[in-house]
Amino acid sequence: MLNIVLVEPEIPQNCGNIARTCAATGCRLHLIRPLGFDISEKAVRRAGLDYWHLVEVFDYDNLDDFFAKNDVKQMWCLSTKAPQSYAEARFEDGCYLFFGKETKGLPEDFLEAHRDQCVKIPMREAARSLNLSNAVAITVFEALRQLDFPGLTEYGKMKK
């Protein structure tokens, strides 16, 4: 099972969309405060639709609190500043995927401390970044692809 870690997310709709991705994929969602919204806000709930009961959500006061409560064996930090592509990463079951706040990304000192675990999603140079919920989905599905989509249904059934 993958772990999505949102460090100080600011936009409730992004959190709701990410929760829905977690519900569909079985990922755990970890939220690092401060949050830019109340988790019970209507916008968060609406974006997650009626999937919230399928999501394991954990919240923490800060990154120190998070690391004190979790045994992180593998982690990847997503950042536009990273030197390598997420496609070069080898994701393991149980890994933690860290994403920063929408306006600033992950803290610079955190990136420096985990330099070898920093990856980016390639994009055009003129674009600053992708939407947070899109970046999470792209990374999660690459990790799941590498793990052969554990616990997921790969094929649908047409009615006719």
Task: List PLM regions with ranges.
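Post-transcriptional modification and biogenesis factors for structured RNAs
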Residues: 1-160
